[in-house]
Amino acid sequence: MDMIDKLIAYEEGMLDGAGMVYLFAELVRNGMAWSLQGHYGRMASRLIDTGILTKDGDIDEMRAIEYGIEM
């Protein structure tokens, strides 16, 4: 699935929690989280603030599980 398909799936609510985390990890890594509409940057910031993602886009799966996201 290419990035556009992933974004459409996210917008349509078709991604589960893990899919959303993986999408935002990719958006942080490639910098798109900060150039798309504001929601994406805010969500990426929340995931970073909670420790689920690092500022480099790495995923802390144990932290995600603590927040109820099945990885």
Where are these regions (language model features)?
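Catalytic phosphate/metal-binding cores of nucleic-acid and nucleotide-processing enzymes, i.e., regions
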Residues: 1-71
